[in-house]
Amino acid sequence: LEKRLTPNTKMIVLTNPNNPTTTVMRRESLEKLAQFAVKNDLIVVCDQAFEDSVYDGVEFVTLASLPGMWERTVTVCSISKGMALSGYRVAYIVADDHIMDVYYGSAVSVIGATNTASQLGAIAALKDASFLEEYNRIFDRRRKIVYEIFNSIPGVSMAMPESTFLCWVNVSRLGTADEVNAYIIKEANVVVNAGTPYGAQGEGHLRIVFGAFREDA
């Protein structure tokens, strides 16, 4: 970050837990990031869409909770992703008043509001999030199955997902991400995401969702 910093740098965008790798940033790393942001007077937009789906007792730390960060952090949370209400298209942000004033003065007129039914569904989910316990049990079991399956295939490997209902699969020994993706669609009629849209390091990887609730999924 120090090497990338310029006089024009105003903001850092962070995804934690990460999409697509599922990595959860540890407290020590977040503390260093917070110190960097404070030192250089930067705003941090922190996407925490999957904050409620973290496995194996890994500690999830909200960046805004660290010293000096509340007044410079925009926390983005997603009902659609975090609570498995994908079709609702509902998210919200949490930030200090001075940031919210700027937001309401610009973004609201562009983004608009979601429909009433989605808002009511989101409110119900936030008031009683007890279903997340079962939701995470299901996905915890599935991620272990997915991990075993992909690591048993010659030329394919993946790390155990730390969060979310995603897995980041390394297929670089089989071909490019686009080639493997096209093969899977043709041979199995299954859609996955090639890793290339996620940047140069996404080449040779596939982003796969194991989030369907059907038992035969």
Pin down the residues of each PLM region:
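Active-site phosphate-binding strand-loop segment of PLP-dependent enzymes
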Residues: 1-57
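PLP-dependent enzyme catalytic core of the Aspartate aminotransferase-like
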Residues: 2-3, 152, 179, 183-192, ...
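Alpha-helical scaffolding segments of alpha/beta enzyme cores, especially the outer helices
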Residues: 28-35, 39, 141, 145-148, ...
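Conserved core segment of the aminotransferase class I/II
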Residues: 66, 71-140, 147-149
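Helix N-cap motif at beta-to-alpha junctions
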Residues: 97, 173-174, 212-215
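Conserved glycine-rich beta-strand-loop-beta hairpin in the small C-terminal domain of fold type I
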Residues: 119, 123, 139-147, 158-171, ...
